[in-house]
């Protein structure tokens, strides 16, 4: 759980208080989920953002998948905020910098209208060298988001549908961490409101490029056997 300073969004507002694990309708077995809440009263001091990720940066090739509930409306308060609901990987620095993003913005941001999902492969964040594809539609509800990395080709999929691919210099050059965060691009008005982003499960396979059907089957098999968390990444390399 991130509590460190810095961005993105409203800097120095990352809070462990906004990370929780409630049960949720529509989750696998209607069980507990990760809930990341972005809340504000419209001021910097009254803002809390939420982020959770892996401590290690050992992820590179393979299949990344997460079942995520994106929200077009706040859980409480007035709507219209430029919130960013993100599933991403990041690692390395300098010539090894690597970042792969799924960024959902129900109300847009940075002057671009929403709802929209940006799938982004980075080469260099300092020079803003990246390639991306925008999917301009509402994603309110549950979706299985996937990123596969194989032979220096990155492919983004949603619910099994291919959204975007990148290759060459826009493929990862180092190990990365896997993260989820929920943050405000800006604070356009005053008043209390809170937005929720939910994550049902995260699955990673370092050795294979899998289909959404194969991922869902694996997750259901593991859950059915009572395995709610395990890490074999180090053993698979």
Model-derived features with residue positions:
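Structural recognition of the beta-strand scaffold that forms the well-ordered cores
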Residues: 35-37, 65-66, 86-88, 99-103, ...
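Low-complexity, Ser/Thr/Pro/Gly-rich disordered linker/stalk regions
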Residues: 1-79, 85, 91, 204-237
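Aromatic sugar-binding interfaces of carbohydrate-active proteins
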Residues: 137-138, 153-237
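Short, aromatic/His-centered strand-loop micro-motif at the edge of beta-sheets
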Residues: 119-142
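Loop/turn elements at helix/coil->beta-strand transitions in domains of secreted/extracellular proteins
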Residues: 31, 97, 150-153, 175
């Amino acid at each position: 759980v991130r509590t460190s300073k810095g961005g993105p969004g409203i800097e120095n507002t990352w809070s462990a208080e906004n990370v929780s694990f409630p049960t949720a309708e529509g989750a696998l077995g209607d069980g507990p989920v990760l809930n990341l809440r972005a809340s504000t009263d419209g001021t910097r001091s009254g803002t809390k953002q939420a982020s959770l990720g892996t401590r290690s940066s050992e992820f590179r090739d393979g299949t990344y998948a997460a079942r995520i509930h994106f929200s077009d409306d706040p859980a409480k308060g007035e709507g219209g905020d430029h919130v960013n609901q993100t599933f991403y990987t990041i690692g390395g620095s300098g010539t090894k910098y690597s970042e792969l993003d799924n960024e959902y913005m129900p109300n847009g941001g940075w002057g671009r209208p929403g709802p929209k999902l940006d799938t982004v492969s980075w080469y260099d964040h300092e020079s803003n060298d990246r390639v991306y594809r925008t999917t301009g539609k509402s994603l309110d509800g549950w979706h299985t988001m996937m990123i596969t990395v194989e032979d220096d080709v990155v492919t983004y999929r949603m619910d099994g549908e291919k959204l975007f691919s990148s290759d060459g210099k826009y493929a990862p050059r180092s190990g990365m961490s896997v993260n989820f965060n929920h943050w405000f691009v800006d604070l356009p008005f005053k008043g209390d409101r809170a937005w929720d982003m939910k994550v049902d499960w995260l699955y990673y396979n370092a050795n294979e490029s899998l289909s959404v059907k194969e991922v869902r089957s694996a997750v259901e098999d593991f859950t059915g056997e009572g395995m709610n968390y395990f890490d074999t990444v180090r053993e698979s390399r």
